């Protein structure tokens, strides 16, 4: 089992609470705060509820970094990595890690979407990709945004729409 610090544990629990309540969530965690590890319990919780989860990130290198970690964390789950040029097995996967561009393939497919590195370049500026996130999720599905540097716009949206919020200073 993974050992989390108290702050990581709290953020993980807060994220589970938000996802269970089908509420969007902003996880604001500085670099090196172990944000990937914080996601494992919430992802496991969703998978145990027979939910389909997508972790989407703007950058292929992040997909390639997360994929083996997710395979290791969820050895009994078929995890799929989707990015430009990937070999794709045509079988259902309950847990997908994908570039945000790959979300365009999906419609109402995911019960939970986690956007990792939500501050990274293409997602911030690309309204089409933001629409893709909304299209790829089921109507009730919550979206969790994970970032070290949330934009003012994201923070304002979080506040206005009463999302869950977790902050990890280190």
Spans of features found by a protein language model:
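Structural beta-sheet core signal
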Residues: 55-56, 81, 143-145
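Post-DEXD/H (motif II) to motif III coupling segment of the RecA-like Helicase ATP-binding lobe
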Residues: 108-170
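Residues immediately C-terminal
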Residues: 59-62, 88, 103, 119-121, ...
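N-terminal pre-P-loop "Q-motif" helix
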Residues: 2-23
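Conserved catalytic network of the ASCE P-loop NTPase/AAA+ motor domain
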Residues: 45-48, 88-90, 105-108, 135-140
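Conserved motor-coupling elements within RecA-like helicase/translocase cores
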Residues: 65, 69-74, 78-98, 102-110
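Walker A/P-loop
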Residues: 20-44
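Conserved RecA-like ASCE P-loop NTPase motor core of nucleic-acid helicases/translocases
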Residues: 51-59
């Amino acid at each position: 089992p993974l050992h989390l610090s108290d702050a990581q544990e709290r953020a993980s629990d807060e994220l589970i609470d938000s996802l269970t309540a089908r509420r969007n969530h902003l996880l604001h965690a500085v670099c090196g705060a172990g944000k990937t590890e914080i996601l494992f319990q919430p992802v496991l919780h969703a998978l145990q509820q027979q939910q389909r989860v997508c972790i989407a990130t703007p950058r292929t290198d992040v997909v390639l970094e997360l994929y083996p970690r997710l395979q290791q964390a969820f050895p009994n789950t078929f995890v799929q990595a989707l990015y430009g040029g990937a070999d794709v097995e045509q079988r259902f996967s309950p847990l997908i890690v994908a570039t945000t561009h790959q979300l365009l393939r999906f419609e109402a497919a995911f019960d939970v979407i986690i956007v990792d590195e939500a501050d990274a370049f293409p997602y911030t500026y690309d309204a089409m990709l933001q629409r893709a996130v909304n299209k790829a999720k089921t109507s009730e599905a919550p979206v969790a945004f994970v970032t070290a540097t949330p934009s003012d716009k994201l923070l304002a949206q979080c506040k206005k729409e009463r999302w869950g919020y977790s902050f990890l200073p280190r």
